[in-house]
């Protein structure tokens, strides 16, 4: 079993090797460890030159990127890996807790597994890797709860609406958001009204409320 572990904290490498060795005692293991996206891409390309592939990859989202390849973080790296090695099992390991970010990771990357680090103990990782290898999808409890909460609001499940909220939280003006999304200001305001109605909040509390709920 050829395993890629990509994380900018090298201290996690040995524990994760142990998790895999425990989960798959009857397999031979070959580990490749990298601390940034550039190293990861180089290892993926090296494997391809040998007509080989990774069987399993653990990827942290918050890693230094590789600008030359337009890969800015672990999320972009996961997309790249999915394109280059579609049969490789992917497991996203992250400290991110924001609802929107986790929702987008699940929807856009469709990893075989995704976990918030604070949810997981050693036995949880071992069980997760076993399930994923058997073809199951794994999500840790926080991921499940936050994704389900977004699905509970049809308005928030819309990607454009989530982008609008994120832009507002980052201080964008309505005109700037309209330009960014190539929509009219009237359309943006209508969407904001729907968002407020769905969340049962008013004009003065929208940003405070979405931050309080952990959406952004």
Model-derived regions: residue spans:
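Conserved phosphotransfer microenvironments
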Residues: 54-81
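Helix-turn-helix DNA-binding segment
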Residues: 148-189
């Amino acid at each position: 079993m050829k395993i890629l572990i990509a994380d900018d904290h090298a201290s996690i490498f040995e524990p994760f090797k142990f998790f895999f060795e425990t989960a798959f005692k009857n397999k031979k293991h070959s580990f490749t460890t990298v601390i940034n996206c550039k190293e990861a891409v180089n290892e993926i390309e090296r494997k391809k030159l040998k007509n080989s592939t990774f069987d399993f990859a653990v990827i942290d989202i918050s890693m230094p990127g590789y600008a030359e390849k337009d890969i800015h973080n672990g999320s972009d790296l996961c997309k790249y890996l999915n394109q280059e090695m579609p049969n490789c099992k992917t497991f996203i390991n992250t400290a991110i807790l924001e609802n929107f970010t986790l929702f987008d990771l699940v929807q856009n990357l469709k990893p075989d597994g995704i976990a918030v680090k604070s949810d997981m103990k050693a036995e949880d990782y071992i069980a997760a890797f076993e399930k994923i290898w058997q073809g199951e999808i794994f999500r840790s409890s926080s991921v499940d709860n936050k994704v389900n909460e977004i699905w509970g609001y049809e308005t928030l499940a819309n990607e454009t609406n989530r982008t609008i909220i994120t832009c507002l939280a980052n201080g964008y003006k309505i005109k700037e958001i309209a330009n960014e999304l190539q929509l009219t200001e009237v359309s943006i305001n209508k969407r904001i009204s729907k968002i407020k109605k769905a969340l049962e909040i008013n004009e003065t509390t929208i940003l405070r409320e979405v931050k309080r709920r952990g959406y952004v």
